[in-house]
Each structure stands twice: as structure tokens, then as C-alpha cells.
Amino acid sequence: LVGSDARPGDTFSRSDVMVLVHIPEDKSKVYLIHFPRDLWVSIPGHGQAKLNASYAFGGAPLLVQSMQNLIGVRIDHVVKTDFNGFEAMTDAVGGVTVYAEEASGATGNGGIDIKQGWNTLNGKQALSFVRERYQLSEGDISRGKRQMAFVKALLMKAISPEVITNPVKIAQFTDAATKNLIVDETMTTDYMRSEAFALRNVRGGDVVFITAPFTGFGWSSDGQSIDVVDQPGMQALGDAIRQDRLGDYKRTSVIP
């Protein structure tokens, strides 16, 4: 799942949201793996750079290639959206209720007051929620946790009885998704409906957050602030995905 920071008039953009979604074979859970944008990685054809630069250099194909090289796992599908997509899909389901680990004030990038705990947000407010990072304790890392919390909230609302039993809301959400999501050619409408139906028994506690492993913060040779990749940790993450045992990985991981 790629969220681009493109705004009107932009020719190139970096990806501010990079979440790898893993659904186990038994469809019992949904794992959301956040890849921090400042991970210092090798980008094919471009040398060392921040992970989100791969999207600016070569779009989704190069981002996928960079991530596959990082964890050693093939990525099956790509879904892209932008800020307008976040807003439109949130409004289509009537807003979302999301948990914030930290409060943030209206003076920050968000422009709204977010309290620590549960917040009910409309589309514009949700967009502010996922963009804020300057007031958060770990900057982009904390923002990534907010983004995963939002994705979870939107997913749970979209498959809730309030939406799936309401023909009007279903139509509104489908229309918003169709207009604001770009998917790879293998993700047909029938495929997406089938996957959504297969996840009908998933509840909030079944949506699990994981942050891709890094050893800490540092500086690149050209003076950029970076997240230092935990190479053994990335290999362990890739093995867990490939072997469909992310539950075991999560229980032993030192990064929440």
C-alpha cells in the first residue's frame, strides 16, 4: 500500500506511506508492516538513498523492487492512493474512529487537535491525522504508527455491518475507492470482492501492526538524517512472511 505525497502540479513525488499488507493463508488476521520512509537502502540504478526516494526515481515498480531486495520476498500486488484518496474514502464510510498514542495540537501540520486515545474523524481530519509528524515523539516513526492505525480503522469501518449492510454506503465507498485507488492489473474487482468477503470475520484485534526493523537513527555520508536498516532483522522478517508465521515474529520482535 503506497501513499504518495503528490499535490496538484507535482511532476514527481516521494511516498510518505509504505505499508506491506500480509494476509495469512487462513485469512484469520491482517498484518500491516510499516516501512519507515527514511530507511537507508540500496535502490537499483541509483545507489544508496532513502526508501521513499525509490518511488520518486521510478514509481511503484522501483519501490517494489527495492522492498523485495530488502526483505527477499516477492510482493504480489500494489495499491496506490494520494491525500485525496485518504479523505474521500473516509468520508464515504461516514468517518472513522481511530486510536492515537499521542496527542497533537492544531498548531502543527495537522491543523486539528488530536487527543491521546480515541478520536472520531471525518475525511479532512483523517488526512491531517496521518500527515502530522513534527509534534510526535519519534517523528516519522510515530507518524507511521498513526498511518497504520488509520488503515486499520478504515478497514474495520468498511467491513462493518454499518457499511456492508447499507447499499448507499457500499456504493459510496466503492465509488471513492474506484476513483482514488490505483491497483495493479491483476487486482480485478472480482478478486478484491473475494478477498474482502474472505476477511469478513476479521475483528479489530486481528489487525496487527509491525514496524520493519532498524537499529536506530544516523546520518548518511551526504548529511541526511536516516534510519539505519537492521539487516539480520529484515532477513528474519522476510523469512516470517515467506513461511506465514508473522505471529511468531511479532511475539519476539523488539520493535513494536
Regions found by a protein language model. Give the residues of each.
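Non-catalytic, solvent-exposed segments at the cell envelope interface
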Residues: L1-P256
